[in-house]
Amino acid sequence: MKKYLVFILVFLAVSLMLQAEEDIRVDRIDFNSLRDDWMQMEIELSCEGNSKEDARDKDYVEKIKVKAYLGYTRDASARSFDYYTSEIEILIMEKGDDNNVYFYLPGLIVERDQLKTDPDFYYVEVSVNGNAQKPQKAAMSSNIPNLDILNSFISKADSEGADNEHVLMPYYLVSGIDLG
C-alpha cells in the first residue's frame, strides 16, 4: 500500500511540475467585433513565477514580450493569406497575476478586406527575457495541429506580412478612440 501511495504522490508531483513549466501561461484568446467594425483580440495571461535559476526574485517575471500572429484567407483557391502581426512588452508580472493584452484591427481594414471576427489562423508567442517559451495549445487556433504547421505559419507571417505592418495595433496605440 505504501509503494502505491508513494507512486501516486510522485506522479502528482511530476504532473504539477509539467503543468507549470512556463513562466507565463496563455489562458484564453478571444476575438470580438466592436463599434465601427473594429476587431479586438483579447489575450489572457497568467504568471506562474520565475523558473530561472538566477532570478532576482522567483515571484516576479520581467521583460515579457507578447507577439500576436493573425492569418486571414484572402483567396482560398490560390491559398493566399493576409497576415497581421504586432507585439507588446509587459515590464513585470508577479506570480499569481492575471493580465489581459489587447490588439486591434481598424474597422476600415476589416470592412475593406471583409475580414471575419475570428481569423483562420492565429498564434500568440510569449517570450521572457528574449527567450521564446514553448508553444502552448491555448495560444493557437485549432487549425494549427502540430509544430510543423505552426512554424510554417510563423515563417509566412513574418515574410509575407510586410504589406500589413503596423495595421494590427496594440491597445496603447488606439487610446482615445471610442470603440464602445
Which role does the model predict for each range below?
Residues 18-20:
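Boundary at the C-terminal end of the N-terminal hydrophobic targeting segment
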Residues 24-34:
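Short amphipathic beta-strand and strand-loop transition segments with alternating hydrophobic
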Residues 32-54, 59-65, 103:
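Contiguous beta-strand segments within globular domains
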Residues 52-54, 109-121:
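Short glycine/proline/serine/threonine-rich loop/turn segments at secondary-structure transition edges
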Residues 56-89, 120-129:
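Extended low-complexity, serine/threonine- and proline-enriched intrinsically disordered segments
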Residues 44-47, 101-115:
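Short, hydrophobic beta-strand segments
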Residues 4-14:
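Sec-dependent N-terminal signal peptides
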Residues 84-94, 107, 123-180:
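Short beta-strand elements
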